[in-house]
Regions:
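Glycine-centered loop/turn positions within well-structured domains
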Residues: 30, 47-50, 181
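A secondary-structure boundary/capping signal
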Residues: 28, 43-45, 141
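Residue-level recognition of short loop/turn positions
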Residues: 35-36
Length: 199
């Protein structure tokens, strides 16, 4: 007898969210299809990875074109697409949205990352580097989720997620969402950053 996808999954993959109940085989736009032919509306979007939908012809063509030209060389080297995206992001940031220009003016620096956790880790490191020793504290929101690395887990405002990994890094405090007074109460001279992900 042939093992089911669920059985095969259980044999080789770690169940950080338990055993997945569905095996998806393809997607189209906002829809997913499982191995039994059932159709689902994809509200999760691969945790925001597939926000443009599944199998979008222009996205698929751009990926295929880039993969057939140059797949990846790390950030130790320059590629033209990397420059084009960074320059475009820089222009958008400097111009602001609508009639509002960036009040900071000038150009920043773009740092590409592989995941949200890695981006948050970089933000935490940049805050520490900017402020130096003594201002390493971070205020984040209760019930937030910032990633699975140790620092982003500490920033995550869900104590039940901290427990299996104690001791977690220190210096993180949490305040209620939509409560400016609670955020202000959490501030102190050692706080160097506020980490909020509203989307």
């Amino acid at each position: 007898m042939t093992a089911t996808p669920t059985e095969r999954w259980s044999d080789v993959l770690m169940g950080n969210y338990g055993v997945p109940p569905v095996t998806f085989v393809r997607g189209s736009g906002t829809e997913l299809f499982d191995d039994a032919g059932n159709r689902y509306l994809d509200f999760l979007c691969g945790l925001a990875v597939t926000g443009l939908g599944h199998a979008h012809p222009r996205v698929a063509a751009a990926l295929a074109d880039q993969a057939s030209t140059l797949l990846h060389v790390s950030n130790l080297f320059i590629t033209e697409p990397q420059l084009e995206v960074a320059e475009r992001l820089d222009r958008l940031i400097r111009s602001g949205t609508g009639s509002e220009a960036n009040p900071a003016g000038g150009s920043g620096r773009i740092l590409f990352q592989n995941s949200g956790a890695e981006a948050n880790e970089a933000a935490l490191k940049l805050a520490r580097k900017f402020h130096g020793r003594g201002r390493h504290g971070v205020v984040a929101a209760f019930r937030s989720f910032h990633g699975r690395t140790m620092a982003t887990l500490a920033a995550t405002g869900q104590p039940e997620k901290h427990e299996p990994f104690q001791p977690i890094p220190e210096g993180f405090r949490h305040a209620a969402w939509n409560d400016l007074a609670a955020v202000e109460a959490a501030l102190s001279p050692e706080v160097g950053a506020i980490l909020l992900e509203p989307l």
